[in-house]
């Protein structure tokens, strides 16, 4: 039987996801170059903010693509748990990039409010409309893959790019109707707030995994109850639960069981491991046993 940790690469449908990442990168990068050029020509901060976000998305797609490649490598003597956390690190880096981008949008928008600049509303609206179609198409590619944290960070990137394009379209229309360029900055600030909130959630979740916190969705006390549900288990301590990747959780603990022979103790451990997989979604368990007769009086 294969050791699951030694085959972490089997977790992802790599071929399909790799193709999605490649397609998304080419389409997004092409549109980003076009949007930057029009943003500079039109003087629109909303377009430049959206183009900057698109640029970060291209970088994000590239990071995730290579993280995916690394994560598929089999475990070895130096990396016994495999390389699954490469994807978590990718999510963390992507989240930080987005946080910094949101802060930069605030800085530029406030500067434009203090010192307004001419904005060509019709160009802004036209490019933004194309951006909505491009970003929505790419976001939909990853909609069903969000259970992977690194893909969720990519989906958030693309979703907010689509939202930013909607904002840029609205800004362009308002500028055409009112001749007031302040709408460009105000909508940029709103986009920045929404982006900051979502990107910080990705950073927080990735940091939690990297610091080996108990994975979200798993209650350590309930896991302990699952172990103690075996009538022969008398005590559980030194319980550790952590995520190796978005989809792979590990556990180690020490249990005290009633005095029994080696064969019976192995059956107890196998049963506990099976229950942990079924009830708590914990794939890899290391359980140290101690017999009651070994305990000091």
Residue ranges and their predicted role:
Residues 35-38, 138-139:
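Membrane-embedded alpha-helices of multi-pass membrane proteins, especially ion channels
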Residues 2-12, 16-19, 23, 46-48, ...:
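Alpha-helical transmembrane segments and adjacent TM-loop junctions that form the membrane-embedded core
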Residues 24-34:
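The first (N-terminal) embedded transmembrane alpha-helix
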Residues 37-49:
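Short, hydrophobic transmembrane alpha-helix segments
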């Amino acid at each position: 039987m294969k050791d699951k940790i030694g085959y972490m690469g089997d977790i992802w449908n790599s071929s399909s996801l790799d193709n999605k990442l490649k397609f998304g990168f080419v389409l997004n990068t092409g549109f980003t170059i076009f949007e930057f050029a029009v943003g500079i020509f039109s003087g629109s901060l909303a377009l430049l903010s959206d183009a900057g976000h698109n640029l970060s998305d291209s970088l994000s797609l590239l990071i995730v693509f290579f993280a995916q490649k690394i994560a598929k490598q089999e475990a070895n003597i130096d990396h016994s748990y495999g390389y699954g956390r490469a994807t978590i690190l990718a999510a963390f880096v992507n989240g930080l990039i987005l946080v910094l981008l949101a802060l930069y949008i605030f800085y530029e928008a406030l500067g434009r409010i203090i010192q307004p600049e001419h904005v060509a509303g019709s160009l802004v609206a036209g490019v933004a409309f194309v951006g909505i179609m491009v970003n929505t198409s790419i976001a939909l590619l990853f909609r069903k893959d969000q259970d992977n944290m690194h893909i969720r960070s990519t989906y958030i990137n693309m979703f907010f790019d689509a939202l930013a394009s909607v904002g840029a379209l609205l800004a362009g229309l308002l500028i055409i109707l009112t001749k007031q360029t302040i709408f460009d900055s105000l909508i940029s600030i709103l986009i920045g707030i929404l982006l900051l909130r979502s990107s910080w959630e990705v950073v927080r979740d990735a940091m939690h995994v990297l610091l080996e916190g108990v994975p979200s969705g798993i209650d350590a006390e309930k896991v302990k109850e699952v172990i103690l549900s075996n009538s022969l288990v008398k005590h559980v301590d030194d319980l550790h639960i952590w995520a190796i990747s978005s989809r792979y959780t590990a556990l180690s603990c020490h249990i005290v069981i009633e005095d029994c022979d080696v064969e019976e103790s192995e059956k107890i451990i196998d049963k506990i491991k099976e229950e942990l997989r079924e009830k708590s979604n914990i794939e890899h368990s290391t359980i140290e046993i101690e017999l009651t007769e070994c305990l000091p009086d």
